[in-house]
């Protein structure tokens, strides 16, 4: 992944964006480039009071484990991200306890609703501030019910099983 900016800060403001996001790749061929570009984005965003979300990933050959994702998340926070999005993994509490800013989990690949809700619950219990799900919401049989179930996990401390029951009742 060799990512660059797709819109300027002025364009983001014109679009009434609430935040800007950028992917950083630790251990990848273009690690240095993504970190420098992210640092520049943070500087630009801070001039306008725009929060920055860092989306963390690791290079090919590196496992999505707490060691590497934790390093990527901590680097993102130290470079000025206001919030970090990363993948859920074993020992997730290592990531949340070493990152200086709130961490949310990426939704990842499409999984059954009960599994997505269990992962969300485990992540929140391990210190995640929330979840950033895409396909596990919009590819759900009932996206509205899934959003409400995820909300129950994040804001009402519902377990994955309780949230799945809510999902089934609402769909």
Regions found by a protein language model. Name each.
Residues 1-105, 110-133, 152, 158-163:
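Alpha/beta enzyme core
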Residues 115-117, 141-150:
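Histidine/acidic-residue-rich catalytic or RNA/ligand-binding cores of hydrolases
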Residues 128-130, 138-143:
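Substrate-binding cleft of secreted/luminal carbohydrate-active enzymes
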Residues 135-139, 168:
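A short, acidic, flexible beta-alpha connecting loop/helix-capping segment that sits on the rim
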